[in-house]
């Protein structure tokens, strides 16, 4: 806590403040906390090594090191440094690619007693030369493949190449080099006003203080995974590194290729289960919180964030807005989003531990709450000063008038205290700006431009584009015309890419004030079309048209031609990433580095690659939101929900090899992630969890029945036992049994319906045949590439459920619910007992010839689909059987509709089924032709084949959900499953004729747990087997006599055959409104139009 003398000093300096304000300022700066002030960074790291040596410390791509391994390698390299003269406060330049080796190097420098100077490998040669010269680094640590970057650099120190073979022969124990927390740890160069960057000297104690902040305020633990995003030259990289390595967490290095692709970045975060990440707001704005599942804490820093960005993320993560200049060890204040953020800005928060904030006037007098002033910082994190810049150090690091004997850093930032103890950032007092999170002194950019032989005057200003992102504009005077490309090239030789102006404007002379200085207020605004000095050339092909469309959108400029320069029009690296991201939606791929090399469309087009989006091939793990059909399942609260399976039995006369089967199913369950689901109860909800590859992935049993004369009964009983053994909470949900018999082997597979459906079985049969064949021939099992995961489908479906496009469907379902009555069908008996054990079956089938007509000849008459015909027949049958003109049934669909752009689930295993109410309107049953067309049109009017009905019910956010009563309660369920036997018959196996116990098999026989409930009064399932259409009617024997259902079955067959015959006999194709995309047009109106056309032609 601040002591009383400090409080008195605050009172003395705040001459105009009230007593309440003095107390307020005292309270907000009361941040004193204990921290390991006498320990260095590497000592704190070594403490973590001793506590958790085998924990993963650092990960990069497929390489990782434990804390022990990282410590050993750093010790080995540190010994080399010591041998070569590195010691206390000596500087070592580090110019390495992002890699584990880079962080070994940093730790090694600290352990040797030195301080490191990070140098970005993408810096221009002149900037690298200046940093090495200015810092007088004794050594430069680099990598062999980067040596070419320093070929033309004059460096008097030692160049050390990081080589594993040289390092590993050294001793790996801790060194115990004498060191103090006030020793220099690193020097970071930032933009300077003199035309050259300046080095800021940071000591160990600032990071030692942050260690406790990470643990106590950010709640970072050894279980966290920290994303390493920032460039080594940016002090956020120090923050990320030691947030992990001083707390026992794991550091995950994210490479540039991933960062440059927003989609790839989101996938990486989810795959690696990153929990804490620090990002510039300019990057976060392009990410989607619905697609990033693992992040628990999101920290934005480097530039101002916006209320809309905070509100977008705050419900999904702990959102922290952090502020802090490099001169105060990275972070000085933080603000945590706890409620809806309104207004025009987001606070930068309150001081972190052992940090004091003072907002003062030019005389260092404290400003009152609400008054703007310069933000000054004191405390443990203050830098030692600027390297070899004593005058600048004394200007910026002044004696602290509030705490004798300490220093105060004058940030040059303008801010004010808010009544709630937070600080509002108001901008800069001087000409310093932030571009994409990097500090930029406008004077440095100006001084570089003035080096150009033809530029006599220049003024650089900052502006905001149509996306509210800052950019630089350089206005210059020159007697000669200077091409824009030449200016960009000249700038890039000395300035990092973020400091290169997006626009250049040439003037004959500068506007001046009465004092003869440049009048910045009179400088022209950049014209967003300025720079298009070439004649307009239109795009010549589809790809060029696509690029023009994207550039115009990203840059906010109209009429871009193929010769226009991306960067001359205001493009930058973030906008380049946006271009690449948007090309994804056109299935095109662009490397952002190519846009840097080829900045015009006519050049760039040759480097655009066709990229049919490749789905993520990694292992899917973690919590997954329930899909609508899964919500429906748990809502029913079936008596035994564990036993609600689908199963299949295969037969192979020559027998199966057990060892091959084990390899095959291991691969299948690894490949098809949904098969590893389990379901837990948590806080009154069901949570769906995709397990990884640990534990038992499936249960496999072998039965030798070769000497058993009663094999069929044993197979049925054992299958039934396995069916009943599935447990949703513990898994696995896949049960396999191999039955050896005298006449071959029977392979039984039971999978809980929550993770499999009819299409899934087709995929599994195909993969089983492929993998078994490969394994039999001693080949590596290689299944077709994964399509998008069930997890991704769930995420995207929830987003779609709340999209404007989807909400337009509400009108259809609203009308259906309000203008349709629930009609109950007749029953022979009244009962409340709807148990599965009372379910019985009646079936009908068509001949092979009749089925062939249905599949191949019928649809031509009215351009129908098979469901149009099957449901028309059902409508006629129900009218005849129950004397009902109009009834609502429940229709099941496969649910894999193409509603999500770029989502490919063609080979994804899971339960995707959709179900929705459909009206069978038979009021004109005397006109067969009309009824077929009416059924077709009614089905075509259903948006996206009905998938939206239960999306509205279960996924749409309550406040967006339309007022739908969901009161329709169909008693009849209809599901056409398609053709199954062709998917099972292969050269390896066929379908077994034996019973599988109680299951919901793909053939539609609905024998689940005997004590489970049957949801519908009648379940009607259609499927094709051995060339014949089969229709089964399942019913409760305590509600119906068998003869009653037989009547319905006979009526259905009779009407179906009549429809088949009618359509086959019809010579001409009769079109309906939906064939012309006129779904709202009634059939009668369509007939009137055709009549008028006929009259006009005669």
Curated annotation (Swiss-Prot):
Catalytic reactions on record: L-phenylalanine + ATP + H2O = D-phenylalanine + AMP + diphosphate + H(+)
Pathway noted in the entry: Antibiotic biosynthesis; gramicidin S biosynthesis
InterPro entries registered for this protein in UniProt: AA_adenyl_dom (IPR010071), ACP-like_sf (IPR036736), AMP-bd_C (IPR025110), AMP-bd_C_sf (IPR045851), AMP-binding_CS (IPR020845), AMP-dep_synth/lig_dom (IPR000873), CAT-like_dom_sf (IPR023213), Condensatn (IPR001242)
The UniProt record lists the keyword Isomerase: yes
Keywords from the named record: Antibiotic biosynthesis, ATP-binding, Isomerase, Ligase, Multifunctional enzyme, Nucleotide-binding, Phosphopantetheine, Phosphoprotein
Domain Carrier: 538-612
Note describing how the cofactor binds: Binds 1 phosphopantetheine covalently.
A GO BP entry: antibiotic biosynthetic process
SUPFAM superfamilies: Acetyl-CoA synthetase-like (SSF56801), ACP-like (SSF47336), CoA-dependent acyltransferases (SSF52777)
A Pfam family matched in the record: AMP-binding
Keyword Phosphoprotein in record: yes
Source species, domain of life: Bacteria
Gene3D superfamilies the UniProt entry points to: 3.30.300.30, 3.40.50.980, ACP-like, Chloramphenicol acetyltransferase-like domain, Luciferase, Domain 3, Nonribosomal peptide synthetase, condensation domain
Further remark: The racemization reaction takes place in the thioester-bound stage of phenylalanine that is formed via the thiol group of the serine-bound phosphopantetheine.
Assembly information from the UniProt record: Large multienzyme complex of GrsA and GrsB.
Task of the protein: In the first step of peptide synthesis this enzyme activates phenylalanine and racemizes it to the D-isomer.
Family: Belongs to the ATP-dependent AMP-binding enzyme family.
Identification of the protein by name: Gramicidin S synthase 1
Upper classification of the organism: Bacteria, Bacillati, Bacillota, Bacilli, Bacillales
Gene: grsA
């Amino acid at each position: 806590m601040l002591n009383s003398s400090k409080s008195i000093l605050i009172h003395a300096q705040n001459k105009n403040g009230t007593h309440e304000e003095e107390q307020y300022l005292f309270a907000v700066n009361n941040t004193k906390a204990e921290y390991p002030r006498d320990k260095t960074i590497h000592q704190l790291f070594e403490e973590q090594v001793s506590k958790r040596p085998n924990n993963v410390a650092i990960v990069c791509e497929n390489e990782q090191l434990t804390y022990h391994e990282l410590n050993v390698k750093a010790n080995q390299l540190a010994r080399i440094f010591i041998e070569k003269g590195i010691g206390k406060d000596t500087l070592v330049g580090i110019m390495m690619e992002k890699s584990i080796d880079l962080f070994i190097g940093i730790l090694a420098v600290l352990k040797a007693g030195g301080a490191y100077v990070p140098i970005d490998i993408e810096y221009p040669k002149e900037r690298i030369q200046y940093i090495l010269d200015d810092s007088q680094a004794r050594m430069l640590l680099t990598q062999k493949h980067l040596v070419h970057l320093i070929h033309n650099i004059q460096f008097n120190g030692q160049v050390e190449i990081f080589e594993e073979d040289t390092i590993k022969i050294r001793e790996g124990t801790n060194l115990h080099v004498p060191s103090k927390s006030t020793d220099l740890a690193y020097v970071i160069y930032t933009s300077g006003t003199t035309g050259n960057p300046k080095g800021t000297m940071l000591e160990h104690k600032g990071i030692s203080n942050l260690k406790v902040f990470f643990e106590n305020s950010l709640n970072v633990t050894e279980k966290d995974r920290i994303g390493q995003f920032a460039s080594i030259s940016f002090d956020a990289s120090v923050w990320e590194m030691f947030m992990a390595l001083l707390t026992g967490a794991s550091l995950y290095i994210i490479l540039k290729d991933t960062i440059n692709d927003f989609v790839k970045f989101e996938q990486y975060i989810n795959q690696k289960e990153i929990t804490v990440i620090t990002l510039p707001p300019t990057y976060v704005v392009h990410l989607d919180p619905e697609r990033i599942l693992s992040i628990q804490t999101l920290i934005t820093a480097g530039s101002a964030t916006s209320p809309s960005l905070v509100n977008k993320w705050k419900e999904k993560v702990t959102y922290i807005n952090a502020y802090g200049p490099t001169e105060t060890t990275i972070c000085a204040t933080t603000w945590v989003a706890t409620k809806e953020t309104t207004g025009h800005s987001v606070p930068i928060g309150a001081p972190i531990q052992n940090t004091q904030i003072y907002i003062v006037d030019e005389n260092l007098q404290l400003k009152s709450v609400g008054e703007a002033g310069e933000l000054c910082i004191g405390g443990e994190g203050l830098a030692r000063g600027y390297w070899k810049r004593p005058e600048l150090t004394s200007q910026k690091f002044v004696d602290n008038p509030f705490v004798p004997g300490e220093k105060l850093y004058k940030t040059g930032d303008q801010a004010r205290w808010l009544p709630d103890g937070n600080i509002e950032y108001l901008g800069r007092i001087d000409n310093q700006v932030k571009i994409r999170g990097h500090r930029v002194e406008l004077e440095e950019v100006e001084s570089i431009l003035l080096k150009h032989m033809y530029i006599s005057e220049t003024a650089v200003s900052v502006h905001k584009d149509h996306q509210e992102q800052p950019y630089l504009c350089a206005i210059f005077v020159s007697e000669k015309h200077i091409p824009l490309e030449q200016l960009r090239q000249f700038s890039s030789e000395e300035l990092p890419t973020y400091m290169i102006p997006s626009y250049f404007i040439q003037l004959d002379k500068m506007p001046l004030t009465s004092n003869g200085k440049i009048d910045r207020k009179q400088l022209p605004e950049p014209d967003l079309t300025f720079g298009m000095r070439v004649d307009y050339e239109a795009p010549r092909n589809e790809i060029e048209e696509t690029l023009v469309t994207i550039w115009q959108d990203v840059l906010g400029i109209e009429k871009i031609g193929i010769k226009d320069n991306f960067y001359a029009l205001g493009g930058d690296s973030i906008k380049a990433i946006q271009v690449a991201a948007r090309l994804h939606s056109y299935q095109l791929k662009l490397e952002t580095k190519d846009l840097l090399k080829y900045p015009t469309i006519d050049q760039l087009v040759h480097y655009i690659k066709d990229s049919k989006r490749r789905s993520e091939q990694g292992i899917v793990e973690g919590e997954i939101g329930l899909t609508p059909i899964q919500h429906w399942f748990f809502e029913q609260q079936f008596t035994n929900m564990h036993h609600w399976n689908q199963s299949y039995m295969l037969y192979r006369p020559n027998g199966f090899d057990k060892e091959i089967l084990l390899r095959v199913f291991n691969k299948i369950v690894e490949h098809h992630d949904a098969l590893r689901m389990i379901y837990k109860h948590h806080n009154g909800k069901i949570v769906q969890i995709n397990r990884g590859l640990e534990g038992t992935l499936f249960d496999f049993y072998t039965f030798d029945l070769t000497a058993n004369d009663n094999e069929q009964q044993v197979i049925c009983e054992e299958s039934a036992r396995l069916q009943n053994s599935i447990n949703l909470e513990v898994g696995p949900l896949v049960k396999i049994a191999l039955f050896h018999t005298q006449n071959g082997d029977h392979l039984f597979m039971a999978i809980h319906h929550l993770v499999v459906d009819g299409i899934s079985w087709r995929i599994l049969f195909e993969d089983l045949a492929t993998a078994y064949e490969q394994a039999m021939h001693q080949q590596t099992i290689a299944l077709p590439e994964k399509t998008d995961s069930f997890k991704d489908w769930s995420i995207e479906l929830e987003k779609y459920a709340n999209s404007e496009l989807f909400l337009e469907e509400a009108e259809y379902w609203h009308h259906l619910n309000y203008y349709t009555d629930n009609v109950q069908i007749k029953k022979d008996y009244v009962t409340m007992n709807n148990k599965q054990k009372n379910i019985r079956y009646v079936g009908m089938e068509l001949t092979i010839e009749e089925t062939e007509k249905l599949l191949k000849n019928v649809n031509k008459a009215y351009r129908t689909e098979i469901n149009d015909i099957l449901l028309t027949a059902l409508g006629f049958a129900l009218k005849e059987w129950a004397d009902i003109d109009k009834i609502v049934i429940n229709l099941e669909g496969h649910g894999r509709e193409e509603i999500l752009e770029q989502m490919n689930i063609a080979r994804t295993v899971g339960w995707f089924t959709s179900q929705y109410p459909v009206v069978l309107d038979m009021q004109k049953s005397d006109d067969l032709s009309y009824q077929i067309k009416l059924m077709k049109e009614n089905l075509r009017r259903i948006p996206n084949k009905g998938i939206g009905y239960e999306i509205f019910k279960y996924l749409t956010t309550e406040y967006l959900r339309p007022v739908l009563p969901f009161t329709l309660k169909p008693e009849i369920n209809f599901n056409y499953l398609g053709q199954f036997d062709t998917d099972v018959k292969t050269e390896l196996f066929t379908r077994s004729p034996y019973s599988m116990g109680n299951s919901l098999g793909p053939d539609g026989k609905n024998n689940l747990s005997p004590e489970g409930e049957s949801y519908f009064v009648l379940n009607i399932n259609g499927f094709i087997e051995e060339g014949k259409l089969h229709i089964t009617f399942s019913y409760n024997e305590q509600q119906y006599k068998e003869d009653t259902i037989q009547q319905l079955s006979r009526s259905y067959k009779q009407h179906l055959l009549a429809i088949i015959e009618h359509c086959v006999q019809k010579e001409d194709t009769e079109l309906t409104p939906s064939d012309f995309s006129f779904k709202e047009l009634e059939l009668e109106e369509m007939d009137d139009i055709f009549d008028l056309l006929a009259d006009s032609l005669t």
